């Protein structure tokens, strides 16, 4: 095995679920090619197109930069990258400059003076200086590394210097996004939600809200027609819940079916029948089951090949008196419950990679217990599945002040930063725009320069 060498890669995506595309590519690169992988933030940029390109190619990109070390030769690394691009879904014969599910480029390789000019690859990347957003991302990770290309007016400049001299033109960068923690945006098709009840009962308003959340940076959109807050004493029947959801899903099918960029669509329900009906209309991908995931729901997830969010709850409807023990650490109780659920799911044939763990903030927990749960993420990671936290605007935030639920976004964002630092995979939130701004800046701590 050869000695590890420095490597710097760029990831780009402007087709499909761009968050998931970057995430899958990054994971595979870390497993197969790059040691000690570190990621920049994600920058959404306008597409760079040649004059006369089809207008349907003009789709914004998500871009990020990865640095680390590799024991692969340049040729071996290139072959591995092509294989990973294929796994993520890139078409083999896509025209140059056309939209793509994933694009992985080798920007830098080896020591600073290493150069390569071959028909298959050029190091440093031949058009790197015309991609100022990539220069800025490299500078965020390794500002003191030098750009070495004989004959270039920028030869021997550090990337920090390059970023200073070659800033992105106005309008090129749309925004920055967190590279690690993805957001689930909430659309409550209810009249009795604590924070926005009645706002999105109309199907057009519900779909418009989903569009807004996606535009603001949600990787997942969670539609729910059944409120489960403590004030709800009786749930809707299957038919009543479906009466609210069906027109939303039909409008979603009408307006979103041919989209080139899209989020994961999730349904917040504990009725398996709702999922089966929904699958006949729109290809949802997640089930968000606040009951914790019954055997029948696990079987539906298995048969339909959907992801299942198992949300811990002590009772439904929520009973404030039915809460977890105060004498046993909250993390241990939730970990034990999660292990039992995963065992049951495994017994019915649901793969572990289809399960997402939600400790259920506010479900069967007092306010102090809910807050304590947010500090137990490392323990929950023992389950081996992604972690989702739904703390947005919930009543336990009254510990920080007696505010109306819709006015709890800043408390929510503050705790979301804490959760991102602990490696939470998904956050279920109402205010996506505020979260993306805060989390992308907070992510800079994890990608501090070396």
Swiss-Prot record:
Cofactor(s) the record lists: Mg(2+)
Residues noted as binding (7,8-dihydropterin-6-yl)methyl diphosphate in the record, renumbered to the chain: 228, 268, 288, 358, 394, 428-430
Gene3D superfamilies: 7,8-Dihydro-6-hydroxymethylpterin-pyrophosphokinase HPPK (3.30.70.560), Dihydropteroate synthase-like (3.20.20.20)
Domain (Pterin-binding) ranges: 181-440
SUPFAM superfamilies membership: 6-hydroxymethyl-7,8-dihydropterin pyrophosphokinase, HPPK, Dihydropteroate synthetase-like
Enzyme class: transferase
Domain of life (superkingdom): Bacteria
Chain spans, region DHPS: 183-450
Binding site for Mg(2+): 188
Cross-referenced Pfam families: HPPK, Pterin_bind
The entry's keywords: ATP-binding, Folate biosynthesis, Kinase, Magnesium, Metal-binding, Multifunctional enzyme, Nucleotide-binding, Transferase
Chain segments annotated as coiled-coil in the UniProt record: none
Annotated family: In the C-terminal section; belongs to the DHPS family.
The protein, known as: Folate synthesis bifunctional protein
Lineage: Bacteria, Pseudomonadati, Chlamydiota, Chlamydiia, Chlamydiales
Gene name linked to the record: folKP
């Amino acid at each position: 095995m050869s000695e590890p060498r420095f490597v710097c890669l760029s990831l780009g995506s402007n087709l499909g679920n761009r968050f998931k595309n970057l995430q899958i590519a990054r994971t595979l690169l870390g497993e197969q090619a790059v040691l000690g992988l570190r990621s920049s933030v994600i920058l959404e940029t306008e597409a760079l197109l040649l004059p006369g390109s089809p207008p349907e190619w003009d789709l914004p990109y998500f871009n990020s930069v990865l640095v680390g070390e590799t024991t692969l030769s340049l040729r071996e690394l290139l072959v591995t990258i092509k294989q990973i691009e294929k796994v993520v879904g890139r078409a083999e014969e896509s025209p140059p400059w056309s939209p793509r599910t994933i694009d992985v480029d080798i920007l830098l390789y080896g020591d600073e003076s290493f150069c390569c000019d071959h028909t298959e690859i050029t190091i440093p990347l031949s058009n790197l200086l015309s991609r100022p957003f990539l220069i800025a991302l490299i500078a965020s990770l390794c500002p003191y590394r030098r750009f070495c290309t004989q004959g270039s007016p920028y030869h021997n400049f550090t990337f920090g210097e390059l970023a200073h001299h070659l800033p992105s033109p106005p309008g090129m960068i749309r925004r920055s996004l967190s590279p690690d923690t993805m957001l689930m945006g909430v659309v409550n098709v209810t009249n009795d939600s604590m924070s926005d009840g009645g706002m999105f009962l109309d199907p057009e308003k519900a779909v418009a809200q989903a569009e807004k959340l996606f535009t603001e940076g949600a990787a997942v959109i969670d539609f729910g027609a059944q409120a489960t807050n403590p004030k709800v004493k009786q749930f809707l029947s299957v038919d009543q819940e479906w009466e609210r959801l069906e027109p939303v899903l039909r409008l979603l099918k009408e307006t979103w079916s041919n989209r080139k960029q899209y989020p994961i669509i999730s349904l917040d329900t504990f009725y398996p029948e709702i999922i089966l009906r929904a699958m006949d209309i729109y290809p949802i991908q997640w089930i968000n089951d606040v009951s914790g995931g019954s055997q029948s729901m696990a079987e539906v997830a298995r048969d339909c090949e959907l992801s299942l969010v198992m949300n811990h709850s002590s009772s439904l409807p929520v009973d404030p008196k039915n809460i977890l023990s105060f004498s046993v650490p909250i993390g241990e109780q939730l970990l034990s419950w999660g292990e039992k659920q995963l065992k049951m799911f495994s017994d019915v044939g649901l793969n572990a990679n289809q399960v997402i763990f939600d400790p259920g903030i506010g479900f069967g927990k007092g306010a102090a217990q809910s807050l304590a749960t947010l500090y137990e993420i490392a323990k929950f990671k023992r389950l081996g599945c992604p972690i989702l936290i739904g703390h947005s605007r919930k009543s336990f935030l009254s510990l920080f002040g007696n505010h109306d639920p819709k006015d709890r976004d800043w408390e929510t964002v503050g705790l979301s930063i804490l959760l991102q630092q602990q490696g939470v995979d998904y956050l279920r939130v109402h205010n996506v725009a505020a979260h993306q701004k805060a989390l992308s800046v907070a992510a800079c701590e994890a990608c501090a320069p070396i």
